[in-house]
Structure formats: structure tokens, C-alpha cells
């Protein structure tokens, strides 16, 4: 493709509404343009990278035995009402009515539609297992769409759904897809981690997220330094700390005037944050609950919500805190509290700690569990922190990372098949419920995540497998007939051996061409100038490492081909 005949509207200035690196660079590189909040046009360069990801996904899905189909974006309300997600999904589900007043939604996901299809068509165990997938645009009405393709309202996604006769067979399907996902992100040239994760609104028994590692990632993840354990911080398990060996001291009231925060109280009392216990008031399905965590730890609301088995969990308002404890925010404590108390595992082994005193400007010292209060539940309800011991092995500790979720796999079990009555007849002619799994990859999000992970001050650094083009040829001067002829010959020869080439034939200054080449992130750049050409050589530069080498013109094609083939076959 010749640059002069292509559509690459690069810009020098960063748009003011762009916040994260990928959003800024995709706009500057002419890959996307905003149409409305969270809705983008994919321009030719951006679309080429998206199609590369799609192709890798399709190849690995097909390799894993999945079969492609395409389902409607518009879905009838009846299916969502059957699964009980019509109201549960919240305002992100864009609902509307047609001219006959029938209710519909724009699909953010397709569990209901695929289950309806399968329940109509699959009748016998002989038709199972079955794995169906699609690549399609989806819509979620995000309240604050931001970060370009990282959190848009409309996005391109691959979603797959497996159907099996038993839980054991479903585990096999899940493992196949898990391995397929690993291959997909490896082939995309990304650094990633597969981590244990919460199932969220999709539901099911267990799940894994695939996280592209990036400092700008929205998600905190942890991994063990010694074993394969990795998890989203929402899901990561905390191990029980050894108990403190100390004799309980007499409970003591201490005045703490205007000292509310952990930092203020611990500084005033001259103690570490690990010797204080925070009492956090929550409301679970309308009922107040007190959650206790150590002063240097944070409450994990997802763990607490699962533990309590509630539908809704939120932090209590100042009014509720004062009504329940008799004190303003900052002075709540478990001693004498008349509501359900849930204590983190860490507190079980603590002795003589500090808590709020349930009165203004008052705290308790030398509080001990069992003597001074008795929790209704003691469980893991905190976020793990860097350096915590691994919950799976004795040798390692947990390290913290930032990640961008690009894929998610779920074991759904019978959640949807039961509510939508998707069944089959087994070998004995008995009706059984189908076991399901679902598997999503954010196609457009993967491209943005790649840029978050691979960039520098000059622009994007695409891995070869998902770059819009493998190589760019830059003619130093388009007025030099020999230079142009050499570029033309290189372009034809590279294209003939399967290398995707962008020939920058514009009548622009070399510096301007090089800046654009760096900005749009083409992995390999061949520079053809009259001086080197007179010696039968061209310059080859790697966008990733910045290495520059002079090659004999006769070797350039095979050298570039070798680099591309090696990257595509990794």
C-alpha cells in the first residue's frame, strides 16, 4: 500500500479530551475518530490491527473446536426476563421499544440468546459437546465512557459458549478455551497473566481473567514469586497470619480529640497501623453490618458480599453510622455494637488492639476478640497486599501488578440453562440440564491494551503480529528516480513473499516521514537514500529496540521476511 493513496490522518497535537496513552496515540496516529461519547469510527490503520486480532482469535477458536455463527445485536426483553437479568443488569443495558411497544435491548452479552438457540435445537446427548462463538459489536451504556477503546460504549468482542452433558465435560471445554486464550495473547505478542477472578454479573462457579500487564491498568492483580498462583486482587486469597503471643491487658478508654483517620489515631497514640482495627459500617440488603479489618488493610467488598450472600452491598451513610454506633464517622468500634460483626481472618490472631469507642473523640485500647466482642463471622474479607504469603505454596510471596482485562472465561454451570430450561435427553432417555461455559475477548480493547503496554515518547510500538503493516519503506527523496525505483522493487519483492508493506512515497521531508512512521508504530522501517544506495545498501531500523543496521539491498527482503515469519510463528 502506498502512503500517498491511503487514509492516515495523523495529527501532531494530542486532543484535549484524551486521557490515557492508547487513546491519545490512536487519535494522533489516525486509527480512530470519536463519533459520540464512547463510540468511535475505526479508520483504516485501526481496523487493520483489529482484523489481525480477529484473525488470530478465529484461528485459535477453530483449532479448539469452536464453530462460528452470528447472533443479532437486538435482543427481546423476554429472554432477559426469563434469566432474571432484565432488572439485575442495571442501567448499562440499553433498553428500548419498537413501534408495537415490544421491549428490546442492545446486547452487551449473549448468554440468553445462545441458550435460547441451543434449547430449541439440541435435544440429545449425541449433539453434545458443542462450542459456538461469534465476533460482533456490542453495546453497554457506560455511565462515564472514557479512555477511548479501553472503556467505550460500543466495542468489538468475541464471545463463545460451550454446552456439555456434565460438570466434568464442561471442565474439559473450559480447559480447552483457557489454553486457546493463552495461545491467542501469546500470538498477539503481549505480556499477560491469567488470573483467578470474580464471576460478577455473568455468574457461574469460577472464572479467570486474562490481563495485559501495563502500568496504566485499571485492575490490580497479584502473582506468586514461587508458584503459578495469580489472581485479581478482588479474588486473591489472604492467608491467616500467625497469632500474637501476648497476655490480654485490661480494656482502656482513651480520649482522641478530633482524631478520626487511621493515620491521625495511630500517630496520636504512637502505634503502627497494624495495631489498630477499623470498623467499617456497610448496608447489606438494607441491614447494617460491621466489617473489621486491620488498620493497614483495605476491605474487599466483593469478598464480603459473597460471604453474606446479599444482592446489594454499600458503605453506610454518615447518618446510618451515627444512628448505629452513637458516634460520628471515625469512632466506630465493635465493643458493645448491637449489629452483625464480620471480622477479617487477620484479626483472629491479634491481641490488645485499638478500635473506635462508639463515642465522639473516644477509642478503646487493649481490645481482644472473644472477651470484648464476638464476631458473627470470621473470614477472609480484605484485599491482599504486596509481600503477603502465597495462599497456595509455602515458598513464595505475592507481588502486585497493574493489568488491563482483555479476556474472561467463566464456568457457568447450569445458571442459564436452568432458568431458560435448556435440557437434553441422556443415553437412558432421561432429561438433563446442559452445563455451560462462556468465554469473552475484547477485540478492540486488546488493540488499545497492546498500545498501553507497547509505546514510547515517539508513539506506538506494535508487535509484528497485530501491527497494521509489518514494514514501512521510507524514500528519503521522491525526486531521486533511482531511490524511487529501489523502493518500488523492494515493495514488490516484500509483498510477493507475504510481508505487509506501507510504502511512504509522499513528497515530505525525511524527518516528517520518520516521525509518522514512529507514531503509527510500524515494527520495521527500511530507509532508502541515495548515499547508501550508491553503495548497494539500505537502512533497517527496529521500532521496538531502535537498532539500526545497514543491509546489502540484495539481502533486505530475506532479512525482513525472516523477522516477520519468526514473529508470526512465536
Swiss-Prot record:
<dbReference type="Pfam" id="PF00587">
    <property type="entry name" value="tRNA-synt_2b"/>
</dbReference>
<dbReference type="InterPro" id="IPR023717">
    <property type="entry name" value="Pro-tRNA-Synthase_IIa_type1"/>
</dbReference>
<dbReference type="GO" id="GO:0002161">
    <property type="term" value="F:aminoacyl-tRNA deacylase activity"/>
</dbReference>
<protein>
    <recommendedName>
        <fullName>Proline--tRNA ligase</fullName>
        <ecNumber>6.1.1.15</ecNumber>
    </recommendedName>
</protein>
<keyword id="KW-0067">ATP-binding</keyword>
<dbReference type="GO" id="GO:0004827">
    <property type="term" value="F:proline-tRNA ligase activity"/>
</dbReference>
<dbReference type="InterPro" id="IPR036621">
    <property type="entry name" value="Anticodon-bd_dom_sf"/>
</dbReference>
<dbReference type="Pfam" id="PF03129">
    <property type="entry name" value="HGTP_anticodon"/>
</dbReference>
<dbReference type="GO" id="GO:0006433">
    <property type="term" value="P:prolyl-tRNA aminoacylation"/>
</dbReference>
<dbReference type="GO" id="GO:0005829">
    <property type="term" value="C:cytosol"/>
</dbReference>
<dbReference type="InterPro" id="IPR006195">
    <property type="entry name" value="aa-tRNA-synth_II"/>
</dbReference>
<keyword id="KW-0030">Aminoacyl-tRNA synthetase</keyword>
<comment type="subunit">
    <text>Homodimer.</text>
</comment>
<dbReference type="InterPro" id="IPR045864">
    <property type="entry name" value="aa-tRNA-synth_II/BPL/LPL"/>
</dbReference>
<dbReference type="InterPro" id="IPR007214">
    <property type="entry name" value="YbaK/aa-tRNA-synth-assoc-dom"/>
</dbReference>
<comment type="similarity">
    <text>Belongs to the class-II aminoacyl-tRNA synthetase family. ProS type 1 subfamily.</text>
</comment>
<dbReference type="InterPro" id="IPR002314">
    <property type="entry name" value="aa-tRNA-synt_IIb"/>
</dbReference>
<dbReference type="InterPro" id="IPR004500">
    <property type="entry name" value="Pro-tRNA-synth_IIa_bac-type"/>
</dbReference>
<dbReference type="InterPro" id="IPR004154">
    <property type="entry name" value="Anticodon-bd"/>
</dbReference>
<dbReference type="GO" id="GO:0005524">
    <property type="term" value="F:ATP binding"/>
</dbReference>
<comment type="function">
    <text>Catalyzes the attachment of proline to tRNA(Pro) in a two-step reaction: proline is first activated by ATP to form Pro-AMP and then transferred to the acceptor end of tRNA(Pro). As ProRS can inadvertently accommodate and process non-cognate amino acids such as alanine and cysteine, to avoid such errors it has two additional distinct editing activities against alanine. One activity is designated as 'pretransfer' editing and involves the tRNA(Pro)-independent hydrolysis of activated Ala-AMP.</text>
</comment>
<dbReference type="InterPro" id="IPR036754">
    <property type="entry name" value="YbaK/aa-tRNA-synt-asso_dom_sf"/>
</dbReference>
<keyword id="KW-0436">Ligase</keyword>
<keyword id="KW-0547">Nucleotide-binding</keyword>
<keyword id="KW-0963">Cytoplasm</keyword>
<keyword id="KW-0648">Protein biosynthesis</keyword>
<dbReference type="Pfam" id="PF04073">
    <property type="entry name" value="tRNA_edit"/>
</dbReference>
<dbReference type="InterPro" id="IPR044140">
    <property type="entry name" value="ProRS_anticodon_short"/>
</dbReference>
<dbReference type="InterPro" id="IPR033730">
    <property type="entry name" value="ProRS_core_prok"/>
</dbReference>
<dbReference type="InterPro" id="IPR002316">
    <property type="entry name" value="Pro-tRNA-ligase_IIa"/>
</dbReference>
<dbReference type="InterPro" id="IPR050062">
    <property type="entry name" value="Pro-tRNA_synthetase"/>
</dbReference>
